[in-house]
């Protein structure tokens, strides 16, 4: 096993070998979830604190279930009623929590880099559950596991990521991971929703679905992140769906066995046709949710192993 990280702050810090180690461990948990659900309780005696400064349904629930499956004592902090609302800084929050000696901190924050700032102030393992537009590493890992299970490999695939790339931490983490695993990545969307400097990311950029989806193995749709927009990026949702919403006609140029992905939450009729999202022969959207629990179990288990080793050596 090769996984030498103290925290999981982003895909950028992971090697190809570490990614494979995480996915292999997650696949073991995924199979156990479909069978005995016996994971051995490797986190028994450890405390996991979930701190979500942004709203979340899937990610927070997934981390909570993952921790409980592994035997951790899980605490969800209500950030809306915490001392942060009274003016406490993130650093003071980190120092306060550190004094309580937690073992795992799962953090989502609206500002890029905030999770790294917190990790520098605590003695436990920190997991980035999404920080601003920066990264969402466990989403990219669960997407990778979903792809690997559906396609039998995670290399030399044509992967299209379509939609609001500019505001998406999911896109950034997936681009980093899929690039490290030697895939061909295509970004599709209106130029107003492409980040500056995207031409230097080692990807292909298209503003036309027919060209971008041609011969693709994987089609990953992203929602319009209106909460991060500060201007008019599209003429209207109707026009956006006409040009960039995934439907059967647009998908027809992809490979016959191409899979459809979406990190959620979905806006049906905006970035994807509802019938296509529910197509059991093409859509792996529910599998993504399922793999999320397995991936988060693997990440926390490996970080906990490293944490225990460091404490034993101290």
From Swiss-Prot:
- Which GO cellular component term is one of those annotated? cytosol
Q: Which InterPro entries match?
A: Asp/Orn_carbamoyltranf_P-bd, Asp/Orn_carbamoylTrfase, Asp/Orn_carbamoylTrfase_sf, Asp_carbamoyltransf, Asp_carbamoyltransf_Asp/Orn-bd
Instruction: From the record, give the transmembrane residue ranges.
Output: none
Q: What is the protein name stated in its UniProt record?
A: Aspartate carbamoyltransferase catalytic subunit
In terms of PANTHER family, this protein maps to: ASPARTATE CARBAMOYLTRANSFERASE, ORNITHINE CARBAMOYLTRANSFERASE, MITOCHONDRIAL
Q: In which pathway does it act?
A: Pyrimidine metabolism; UMP biosynthesis via de novo pathway; (S)-dihydroorotate from bicarbonate: step 2/3
Quick one: which residues bind L-aspartate? 86, 169, 223
- Quaternary state and partners of this protein? Heterododecamer (2C3:3R2) of six catalytic PyrB chains organized as two trimers (C3), and six regulatory PyrI chains organized as three dimers (R2).
Q: Which HAMAP family match?
A: Asp_carb_tr (MF_00001)
Catalytic activity reads: carbamoyl phosphate + L-aspartate = N-carbamoyl-L-aspartate + phosphate + H(+)
GO terms of molecular function = amino acid binding; aspartate carbamoyltransferase activity
* Listed EC numbers: 2.1.3.2
